[in-house]
Amino acid sequence: MVNLDFEVEPCLFPSLSTRSVNQSHGKAMAYQHGFEWEVTISEDSVFQGIVLSWNILLAKYTDSTTITFGVISGSEGNKCHDDTTVDEYCTSFHPESCLPTVLPLASRRQYRFHEWKYDARINTCIANGSHKVWLDHWINSPNHGIKLILVVEQGRWPCMSLYGKPSFIDEGSVRLLCTAFQHILDCVLENQMGLLKNIEVTPSHHYQRILDWNSHIPKEPLAECIHDLIQRRCMETPDAEAICAWDGTMSYAALEQESARTMEWLQHHGVGPETIVPLLFEKSKWTVVAVLGVLKAGAAFVLLETSHPIERLKSICHDIGACIILTSALCKEIGSNLADITMSVPCDVERKLPCGDGKMKPCIRAQPRNAAYVAYTSGSTGKPKGVIIEHASFCTNAMVSSEAQNLNGCSRVLQFASYAFDVSIHETLVPLMLGGCVCIPSASQRVNSLQEAIVQLRVNWMELTPSVTRLLSPHKIPNVKTLVVGGESISPAELARWAGHIRLNVAYGPAECTVVSMVQSNVTKHGDPLSIGRGCGGSVWIVEPQNHNVLVPIGAPGELLIGGPIVGRGYLNRPEQTAAVFIQNPPWQAENNSRFYKTGDVVRQNSDGSVVFLGRKDTQVKLRGQRIELGEIEYQASGFFPGAAVAVEVGKLYHGHPALVLFVEWKSLENRKRCSGTNCCRTVQNDKTHFMSNAQWAKAGLSQILPSYMVPDIIVPLCTIPLSHSAKVDRKALRAMITRWSKDEVKLYQVTANSTSCGRYPHHAGQKYDEMVRMVARVLSLDPSEVREHDNFFQLGGDSLSAIMLSREIDTIPLLSLTVADIFQSASIAELFHRSQKTPLPESMEPGIPTKVLPFSLLDPMKIDNYRERAAEHCGVSPSQIEDIYPCSPLQARLMARTSRQPGAFQGHFNFRLSLDTDWDRLHWAWNKAADFLPILRTRIINTWQLAEGNPLQVVVRDKDIEWVEVAASESEPKSRMSFGSPLIYCVAVRAKHSPVLILNIHHALFDLVVFEQILEAVKAAYQGKPLVWRPFSPFIKYVQDLNRSQANEFWKREFTGLRAVPFPADITPGRSNLDAIRWTRKSFCLGHQNQAGITLSSLIRLAWAMVLSQYTGSLDVVFGTTVMGRNMPGTADVGGPTIATYPLRITLRGEESIKEALQRIQNHGIAIAPFEQSGIQHIRHSSPESAIACSFRNMLVIQPSSDNSLLAKRDLSPLLVLEERGSWKQKSYVNFSTQALNVVCEPGAGHLDVSAYFDQSILSSQEVEEMLSCMDRLLQLVLQHPDASMGTILSQSQSPDGDLDRYEERTSLARLEQEACQYLGNGVRVAAVWIIPMASHVPKLALFVGAMSLNTVSDGRWILAGVKEPLRTRLVQMMHEFQNNPLGRAVPFCCIPVPLQYRPSMPGLFLDRARAQEAASKFTLKTLTSWQNTGDSGFEEPLLPLEATLRRALAKVLSLEPEAIGVNDDLVSLGCDSLVAMQFAAQCDRQSLRLTISEIFQATSLRCLASTLNSRPSGDPTPALEAFALLKPMYGDRESFEQDIQRSVDGWNIKESIDAFPCTTAHLGLLSGLGTCQSHTIWEIGSPEEQIDLVSFAKAWLNLVNRHAALRTLLLPSRSNPSEWLHVVLKSSPVGVKVVTKLKNASLLKIARKPLLSRDGLGGLPYRFAVYQSTTGRTLCKLEARYAFLDAFSVLVLMKELRRILDCLPTSDPLLPSYSSWVAYLRRWSEDPLHLQFWDRYLAGLKPCILRASRNHHHHQHEGRQHHGASETNGNRPRLIKSHRQIVVQDAVALRKYCDQRELTITNILQVAWALTLKEQTGIEDICFGALVSGRDVPVDHVGNIVGSLFNVLACRIQMPATDSISSVLLENQQMMRERASHQFCSLQEVTRLVLKARPEASSLFNTCLSVEQPLSDEAETGKGFRALETVEETEYDLIVAATVFPDRIQASIMYWSYFCDPARAATIAETFAQSIERIILCA
C-alpha cells in the first residue's frame, strides 16, 4: 500500500463508558466478547468483509463518512510489542456506494505500537491473526491510545473477539457493539454486491432492548385538567400554604377564592376553551392567581416576560390573536398596547367583577384535550413560534415525572425561571397539583440575592441552570433537599460539589414535550455530567439525523425523538413547521397513531438506557442556559445589512467564555478580489469606521427587537461567509475562527449600543477606581491592564453570573455600591464606576468637632473643685484620681436613666475565645493599657442634683485598672451591677484548660459599634507591643454643647410645622412602656443591592417604613423615632465614645412623586438633619407644640450599620480574641432598649436584611406585627424594583393580604373613635379627634372636639370651651367615662372639648380646621380645657398633704411647668415623665431628702401614689427561687422518707415520677377542712355557633397549658405521718388527658356537660378534670371541674386567657414563671409572725355568730344538710346546690365610680356594705359578720398575678351598723378595715374561728353566708377564640353564697344556696334586698 500525505480529520470512536473517566481501577484490564460462525468463502474475502463491516460500524458511531483505523497484520502478531507496527488505513464512502467499492484507500502511515499515546488520530484497531504478545502488553497499558481492538482468528470457523478498555467502554456496550458488528457483517457477506445504504445497521436485539426501556411509558394521556387537580388539593388542604412569595403568602383556600374571581371576570368577557390569554406580570403571587384563573375559565395562557422588547411582545400577542390581556398594576400600561382589553390582577378584577344579575354567559368547561398554555421559543423564520400544550399532556407529565424528580406534596419549589421559558410553568403548576408550595422571589432577589431568598422562602426543591448553581453554596441553603439542573451541561466539579450534599437530578426536555421529558435521578459524585437520564412520561428513540425512519444502534449518535402522551399539539399557526418536526407512525413504531417530536438534539444511548447529550444538529444552540434559534437572529440582523449575507454563531473566546457573534459579508469589491481559497474568511481591514458605525446602529436596533441574551456581543465583517461542500454556511469554520481570535482581535469588533457613551465621564485615576478595575479583572480572569475605561463589562467576557459576583465584590469597597442592574445598564467601565459612587456629604457640614479639649473646661470654672469632690465621693475614689468631668450626651443620659429604672438594662456581654498559649498576665496588662488611651473605658457616670440639677455627668478616673475577675471553668460568672458612680466595664477571665474564655461586660453608655472595634484594636495592639492611638470623647461632647440651640430649635420647629401625623400605635397610655409585656419577632428580607446610584440603604428602609406607617394610619404624613450612628460630621469617624443619637423623623409621602425622587428627597433630608441630630429628644420636644407631638412617637426604627457578628467576625483579631455569637444577649439587649410600643431593628447583611420587631403585646399582637413586617418587605421590594413608579401606584399595590390591614385600621383608627362618639351622642352632633399640646405641657393629648347646635360661644369670644348644658353635659361625661374605662382597643381620648357647631373652619367641607384647633387648644391648660365638666367637684385635685405639695413642686421644676398645672392624681407618664425626666425628678426629690428610685416613680401612676410609697415602703422582698422538695425538709428530712410515706396515699401512680412537692398553706388547709370533697365547675361556650372548633387542636392547646403550669400536674394528697398536713405533689407529666365528647344533640349538650367528672371519694388522682363537648351542629362547650379548692377564680381566668392565646397562635408568658411553690414559701414565712392571729382576735372580739336562718319549713333539714353536702351521693338524698341569677344594672355607673374614686373607695367595699345591709334586714342584727373572699395576689412575690393555684382565702368581714351611723361613715370605716384585713389575710379561717369561739363551745361557726366579688371569667372584648361563661357552680360549706361579677356597665350577682336551706322564693327575696341595698348606697352617693 502507498502512503498518502493529506490531511483528514481524526476518526475517534466515542467513549461508551457509563463509569466516570476519573474513577480509578484496581488493575489494568479489558472487556472481551467473542463470537464465531461458519463461512464458506475464502479467508481474504472474510477479512475484507470484516474490514468493510468495521468501516460501516465506525461510520455509524463516529457520524463520519471518512473512516480511519489501524490494522495489525498476521505477520506482526508474533513480534515483540516493541517491534509491532500498526498501519493506519483511511476509507471514504457515500451512502449510494456499492459495497465492493468501499475499501480502504491506502495505508497512510505506520506507528510503533508501543509509541501510541493520547495524541493519536485513531483509537480503534483490527488485528488479523495471532496477538498474544502485544495484546498482553496493551491490556496492562492503561494509557495506550488504542481503546478498542477487534482481533480476528482465521480458520474454517473464524473467531473474533472485541477488546475494550474499561475506562473507555463498559461491558454492556461491548456486548451491544459486538451484536451490531455481527449483524452488519452478516448483511455484508449476504449482500456483497448491494448498496451501502441498504445495509441494516440496527439489529433486532437492539430494537427489543429499546422497547424494554420504553415499556414503562404510559400509552394514553391522563384524562384530567390542570385546574381540576389543583382544586382537589384546595379541598383536601385548604389551610396549607400554596404560595410563599416576596409580596405575600396565600393558602390553597385563598388561591381558590382569588382565582375564581379572575375566572368569573374572564368568563363574563367571553373567554373559554381554545382562547389564548396573555399574562404580563413581574414575579409575584398574583401571576399564579392569573394562571389558575385563566385555566379555570377554560382558556389557555401565555406568559410574557416583562423585560422583553415591546416589539417581541406585540409579535406574540398578534400571533395568538389576543383580545384580552391580564397584567399586574405595574405592567398595565404596557399591556394596554398589546390587547384591546387590559385588566390588572387583583385590583381591576376585584373592582370590576360583574354583578350577579343572572346574565353571565354559561360556562364551557375545558376538556383534557383542550389547550392549557402556549410556550414561545425562538424561531428560525425570524419570529418566535408558539408550542401548544394540552391539559392531558401536562397532567400526564406532572404525575409521571415528579417521582423521578423527588417532587411531591411536601416540596417548596423555587419559582426561579423567567416567564419566557416553559420551566417557569412547571415550577408554578406542578407543585400545586401535588399539594406543595410555590416559592417566588422578587426580580431583584432573583438576580442580586438568590441564596438569601432561598433561605427566607424555606425552599427545599429547585431547578436551576449550572451557571446559576455556581452562585450558591450547599452549606448556606441547608433546607434544600433536591436540586434539578437543566438547560445546559453541568461540569464535573459542579456535579461533585452538589451531589455529596443533596439529591441532585439532571432534567431535560424541550418545550414541545411538556417541559420535562428525561431525568437522571439521584446523581452521584462520579456520575456522568453529560447524561440526561432516561425517559419519564415520554418514550425515547434515536434515529439517523437525516432520516428519522431509521433507528441507529444503541451507542451510536443520532437525533433524539420523544414520543407518547407528553408530546405537544404542535406550533400555533405554523402547519408546515409542525409537520416537519411532529411526525406520526414511523416504520419502526408498530403502534398506530403514535406521535413523536424530533428534538434536533444529537444524543447517544448507553447500555443501561440512559442518554448522553452530544449537541445540536441544526442552528439552535444554548447560550448561558437560554435556548436560541440562530436563524431568528440572522433573520432580524439581515434587515440592518440589506443585501449582505449574515451568519450567527456561538463560540468560545480566548478567555473561555462563550460569545454570540454576528458575521456580516461586507460588500467590498476590492476585498472580494483578494479573498480566495483558504483565506476567504479574512476579516475586512479597511473601511472599518464605516462598518462599525453600521454595527452600532444594528446592535441598537436588535436590542429593541430581541431579548438581551439574543443580541450579538461581537459583529465581525468578512470578505465572504465560508460555505461547506453542500453550499451551506460552514458553521464549523466560523466556530473555529472565533476560537482562534486573540484579545486584540476580539476588542476590535466589540460593539456597544452607544460606544461614545463613555465619553460623558472624565478620566478616572484614584484608589477606588483602581480597586474596582482590579475587581473587574479578577472576576473576569483578566489582567488589570486589559480593563480600560471605554470597555464594556460583557464584551470583556462578563455574563450574568460574573455580574452578580462583581456586584458582591464592589460592595466591599467603602462608599461604592453596584447592583446587577447597574452593571447591565452601564455601557463602559467608566460609567460603571460612576454608578457605583454614593452621594458624598456636602461641604456645609463643616466645621467638625474640635481636635482637643482641656480637662474640666466644659464645667463652670468657679465650681471645678466642688465638682471633683462630689464626683470623687460618688465614685468612691480620691479627688486626685479625677482626670476629667464633662456632661453626658443626650443619649448617654437616657441610657443611664433607663438602667436606673431597670437594673441590668443596656449592658453588653461578649464572650471571646482565646488560644491555649495566651499570656493571661500580658492580656490583663493590654486591657489596662488600652484604657489609658481610651478614656471612655475609665469613665463613670454620676447623677446628683448638687452638680448639674439632675443632668448626669461623666467622670474619667485615672489610676484605676479595669475590673478583672478570674473564675474557674466550673464557677458561674459573677454579676456586677452597673449604676451611677460604679465602673461600667469589667472583664471575667475563665482560665479553662482546654477552652479559655474572656467575658467582656460593658454598658452601652460607653460604646457603640465603632468604639467596640476601637477597643479590640487597642487591646490587640497593646498585646503585640504596637503603638496605640489616643481617642478622647470630650471633643465630641464639646461639639454637642456648642451646638447653636436657637438654630436647632428653629430647625426642629420648622421641621414639624403643620404636622398631621397620626401616632402609631394609638396606645391607651402614651409613653408608658411595660417591659414585662415586650415580645419580639424576626423576619429576614432578601435584599438585592439598590439600583439607585447615590441612594443609601438607610434611605430605602426609611421610605419603606414610612410607607408602612402610612398604610396603617391612613396618613401621608408620618413620624417615627430613629437612631443613627451620629458620625456624619467631619472628625466624628474616630471619636472614642458613643455618638449614636435619637430623634423624630418626619416623612411626607407624595402620591405623584416617583420612588426615585422620594428616595433622593429623603436622603437629602437626612443630610440636612445631620448638624442637628445630637439635639436630644428633650430639647427637640420644647421647640414647638408640633415638635412635642413628634417626640411622642410610639414606634422606633433603628438601622444598624451591619450585623455585629458579621462585622466583627471579619476583624483580624485572631489568634488573640475570637468573638463568639451571643444571640441571646442581643435579643435581651434590644428588649431592654424597647422604650416604645413598637421598636423595629434592621440589620443589613450580605444580600439580606434582618428585621426584628420588639413590641408591647398589650398594645400590638404578634400577628399584627408580623403582618407589618410582611408589608414592609413587600414595599421594600417594590421600591427596589420600580424606582420610576409613582408613590401612589406603589402604595396601592402593597395592601396587606386577606384584608388584615383593613381589620387593623378598623380596630385602631381615629375614625372608629369618631364614629362611636357620634353614635353615643346622637343626631345633631359632630365629632373630630385631634392631637393637641395643652399649655404648660409637652406631651400630646388626644382630644375629642364635639360640636353641637345647642352649644353657645363663651362670652369672651373664644370659639372653644363653649358653655355646656344638660342633658348634653351628662352624655359627654358618660361617654368619656365609657371610653376611658372600657377602651376595647380603640384610641382613647384624654379630654373632651365642646365646640359650637356654628363655627366655620377655614377649609370648606370640614367640621373642624384641625390646625386651628391645635393652635387654639395650646393656649389653655389641661385643667382649663376640662373645666366645662366641673360642677363643684373637679377631677383635678390639689395636694392634701405637704408631702404631695413637695413632690408637685419638684416635678413642676423638671417639666418646666407651673405647679398649679399638675394635679396629684394626674398620670405621671401623661405629664411627660420619661426615663430622663424621672432621673431628674429623683434628683430634685433627693435635694428635699426624699429618696426615690426611678423604678418607684414608674410604678406609681400619680404623685399621690408616690407619696403613699414614700410613707410606707414595701417590706417584702421578691421570693428567691426554691430547690425542688426544699419545703418538705422540716417534715421529712429527706426525699426518700417523703416517698415512702406518700406512696401509700397514691393509687396507681409512681411517686418517683414527681419533680417537686410542698405542703399546703394554712389558709388552704382551713378551706379544706370546711369544703371536704365539695366540687366546683365552670362551663364555657367556645367561639360562635357558626364557628367550627377543631377539637384535636383544642385538646392539644389544653395539654400545652398542662405542660406550662405545674399546678395542672399536681396531686393533692394527705400525709400519712402528719394527718393534719396535705401535700402538693407535682408530677413530671400529666397522667390524665382531655375528655372529648362529640356528636351530641344541641338540646342535651349542656345537660351532659353538667354531669360530674370527678368521683367524690377518690384520692390519689388529679383534683381537676377538663372536658370538651361538641354537638352535631358544631356548637362547642368546655368544662373545668375541680375540688379541694384547688384553683381560684383568678387562676381560671389566667388559664382561659392563655388558652385563648395558644389557640390564636399568640405568644404566652415565660413557662418557667411563675411558681406556686414560691407563693407557698412566702406564706410559710408570713405565718411565723404571731401578730396576724392577734389582729383577728382583737378585730373579732365580742362578736356573736351571724347566722342567716333557713326558711321556716327548712329548719329541721339545715343541720342534716350540713352533714350531707360533703358526703357521697346515695339514693338521691344528697342536697342540691341551687343557683339563681339576679342582674343588677347600675343606672349611673359613672357616678358610682366617680364617687368611689373621690373617696378612695372600691366597688368591693360598696358590695360588702350592701350585703351587710341585706343581712341586717334579714337577721335584725347590727353587728354583721360574713365571709369575704380575697384573691391573695397582693403580695411581694414575683409574677404573682400569673400564678395558677389556690391563692384565695375567706376572711371574716365584720361590719357594725348601728342605726346612728350613716352609710358614708360605714363605707369609710370598712374601707380602712379592708386594708387592715388584707395585711393579715392569710390566716386559716379554721384557726380564726376556733380562736374567736373558744368561749362559745356551743357555736360551730361565725357565719353561714359568704360574699365573693370577682372579675368575669370570660372577656367579651377579646378577639380570637372567645370563651363565654355559661355557668359557674361552686359547692360551698356555707348555706348561702353571693357571687358578684363586676362588669364595666353592670353588676351581676348570683346567689347559690343549698336545697336544704331555703326555697327559690326566699332566695329571690334575698336577691331583691341585696339589689335594693346597692341602689340605696348609690342614692346616698
Swiss-Prot record:
The keyword Repeat applies. It catalyses: 2 L-tryptophan = cyclo(L-Trp-L-Trp) + 2 H2O. PROSITE patterns: AMP_BINDING (PS00455), CARRIER (PS50075), PHOSPHOPANTETHEINE (PS00012). It comes from Penicillium ochrochloron. Gene3D superfamilies: 3.30.300.30, ACP-like, Chloramphenicol acetyltransferase-like domain, N-terminal domain of ligase-like, Nonribosomal peptide synthetase, condensation domain. PANTHER family: NONRIBOSOMAL PEPTIDE SYNTHASE ATNA-RELATED, NONRIBOSOMAL PEPTIDE SYNTHETASE. Residues 763-840, 1438-1514 form the Carrier domain. Residues 251-638 are annotated as: Adenylation. It comes from the Eukaryota. Keywords: Ligase, Phosphopantetheine, Phosphoprotein, Repeat. The gene is okaA. One of its GO terms (cellular component) is cytoplasm. This is Nonribosomal peptide synthetase rstn8. NCBIfam families: AA-adenyl-dom. Residues 1754-1774 are annotated as: Disordered.
